[in-house]
Amino acid sequence: MIEDRGLRIADRKKQSARVADAVMSTEDFRRRTFQFGIRVIRLTESLLKMDAARVIGKQLLRCATAVGANYRAAARARSRADFIAKMGIVEEECDETLYWLEMLIELRLINADRSKELRTEGNEILAIVVASIRTARRNAKGAVRYTDRA
């Protein structure tokens, strides 16, 4: 798993560029992140009743459901800075979700083929979030502030 990390990072960059081109409404993305959480809940329900699987499953459950919950909060942000900060949390939670999925696969507690769609969805959500943060930061730098006007 660790040897191919450089390749996965390169794949994420390519994926991020593709995903940034796609236009998705706030409501569509809210639904997508919600469904991602639902799919992870279903996956964790099927984990064996071993201690390690249960502990990792709970971690996975927390961070995967936090993706949608925190995106919902970001969509209601009061300022661009607030949006960027909340989207940063979404990014962290999504990345942590992918980490726990990799851990479960490496420990052979879940089948890599069975979780492939879920990992793909997680990577796509992560790419969208990263692209959104970059766009918001770029727009924040170019924004004209009312106090700057003469």
Question: Which residues are covered by each model-predicted region?
Answer:
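Short, C-terminally biased terminal segments at protein or domain edges
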Residues: 1-150
